[in-house]
A protein has these predicted regions:
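Active-site loop/oxyanion-hole signature of alpha/beta-hydrolase fold enzymes
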Residues: 2-39
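Alpha/beta-hydrolase active-site loop signature
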Residues: 5-10, 71, 185-188
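Gly/Ala-rich beta-loop-alpha elbow adjacent to hydrolase catalytic centers
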Residues: 41-50
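Flexible "cap/lid" loop of the alpha/beta hydrolase fold
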Residues: 55-91
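Conserved alpha/beta-hydrolase catalytic His-Asp/Glu region
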Residues: 76-78, 93-146
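Conserved serine/cysteine hydrolase catalytic core
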Residues: 133-171
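Catalytic histidine neighborhood in serine/cysteine hydrolases
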Residues: 173-187
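Catalytic histidine-centered segment of alpha/beta-hydrolase-like enzymes
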Residues: 184-197
Length: 218
């Protein structure tokens, strides 16, 4: 189950709350007849929704993988101030046909531009404001059972800004796994080598360990 960042970037959706986002995901899974999840995968700010999902879903989850998780704990006032700046940054991706992507992300690869352009097109200020109001909150991380921690991977690239959250996450979930992709930037492996990234996730789900990759910090 690959958790979305949020439905605020999807056409025709309205953001109500994080709980409603989780309900939509669970309803979808139930309609598909899903009774267990081999793995939950989340990237960047999608980590916020995924962590809430993991702590509240009744579906059995065998593994979880976070790629460059946005685990910031930001005060309510700061989140309110940052909302308009974030809105214009994301909307600019649509207005510029992806031309401003390099200002937001480390790369502007043509293979990922359409997704960011679509996100910028669909985003409304009201939906983003509602999402930010109950995301990245300045409160302790939700507890994860030790057994699930032992099968959860919090991966960060050594060059990415989100690497700064690694220590706090390690303290919150001491039984988790914390691979570092040496020399890699934010989500770089899944962007540059999606087949390799998918193969890595399959290896974890099937063998319960990281594969031998040359760029994993020893």
């Amino acid at each position: 189950c690959i958790l979305p960042t949020s439905t605020v970037y999807c056409e025709g959706q309205k953001y109500v709350s994080k709980l409603d986002e989780i309900r939509q995901v669970e309803d979808f899974l139930h309609r598909q007849g899903v009774e267990r999840l081999a793995m939950v995968v989340a990237s960047s700010i999608g980590a916020d929704l995924a962590m809430a999902f993991l702590t509240q879903t009744k579906l059995p989850v065998e593994h979880a993988f976070f790629d460059g998780g946005q685990f910031a704990q930001i005060g309510k006032g700061t989140r309110r101030i940052m909302t308009p700046f974030l809105y214009f940054a994301i909307r600019s991706l649509y207005w510029s046909k992806g031309g401003t992507l390099k200002k937001i992300l480390w790369c502007d690869d043509d293979s990922i531009k359409p997704y960011f352009i679509s996100a910028g097109k669909n985003l409304t200020y009201t939906d983003l404001r509602r999402q930010i109001s109950d995301s990245l909150e300045d409160k302790p991380f939700p507890p994860l059972p030790q057994k699930l921690q032992e099968h959860t991977y919090f991966e960060f690239g050594s060059k990415e800004e989100h690497f700064k959250y690694r220590q706090a996450v390690m303290e919150a979930y001491p039984c988790g796994h914390y691979p570092v992709f040496e020399g890699y930037d934010h989500m770089q492996y899944q962007i540059c080598d999606p087949k390799g990234f998918a193969g890595m996730l399959t290896h974890i789900a099937e063998r319960d360990c990281m594969p031998e990759l040359p760029f994993i910090r020893k």
